[in-house]
Regions:
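Ala/Thr-enriched low-complexity intrinsically disordered regions
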Residues: 2, 7-9
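Loop-helix junctions at membrane interfaces
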Residues: 11, 15-223
């Protein structure tokens, strides 16, 4: 029997302040009530990210699917800071390791790309906390994530796939959709834009729901 870690508990543990200073902020600077909401918020977002990772929308390339598991991490980066976003990405992928079919390669790639996305967006938003800054940071983060996805897929993910599906067969899936004569070109034409669009969708949804969720995430009552 496979034992799966509890997403909320793991998120709670990683986001919990340790020692005299927490991972994300100093205890001296934040009141206890805020720290409580930080811990609970991280746990809830990590659990949501884990659940969303299992809700996939298939794409024309049958081994690539669209999911929205980066959305909770993006919300966490905006609410609690960029490091929180990375921690939520970490928890999500640690949980998914229990049912991994990619030899942990997929989770590693997902963590790298998701961390680049949320870290970039969170850092930009941290400098100027406006809706425009959040959207700009998210789009820039999605763009960088898309760029990083090229070497990640080419050198990490796809070499693992070749153990189960010949390189020629993988290329054939792409060739059924458009003219391409190499895996390198296929990843550039399909995977990179796909990754960017995936990030932009998360940014668009976050722009719509972050403000209504902000009182809960920040532990503040609506006025």
């Amino acid at each position: 029997m496979t034992v799966r870690p509890n997403a909320f508990a793991l998120g709670f543990s990683l986001c919990r302040p340790h020692g005299r200073k927490g991972i994300i902020m100093s205890e001296k600077k934040k009141p206890t009530s805020y720290k409580t909401h930080l811990i609970v918020g991280c746990g809830v977002l990590a659990a949501a990210a884990t659940a969303l990772q299992y809700l996939e929308i298939p794409s024309p390339v049958n081994f690539i699917a669209l999911d929205f598991s980066d959305l909770p991490a993006l919300l966490g980066a905006f609410a609690y800071g960029p490091i929180a976003g990375v921690l939520i990405e970490l928890v999500k992928n640690l949980i998914h390791l229990a049912v991994s079919k990619s030899g942990y390669v997929g989770e590693l790639s997902n963590f790298i790309l998701g961390s680049v996305f949320t870290l970039t967006a969170g850092l930009i938003y941290k400098k100027k906390k406006t809706k425009k800054s959040a959207i700009l940071g998210g789009i820039i983060g999605a763009l960088i994530m898309a760029v990083v996805s090229y070497p990640s897929n080419l050198f990490v993910v796809y070499p693992f796939y070749y153990n189960f599906m010949p390189k020629e067969a993988v290329l054939g899936v792409y060739q059924a959709l458009f003219k391409v004569n190499s895996i390198e070109m296929a990843i550039l034409i399909y995977n990179v834009p796909f990754t960017f669009i995936k990030g932009v969708i998360s940014v668009a949804v976050s722009a719509l729901i972050y403000k209504p969720l902000k009182p809960f995430l920040k532990g503040k009552s609506k006025k």
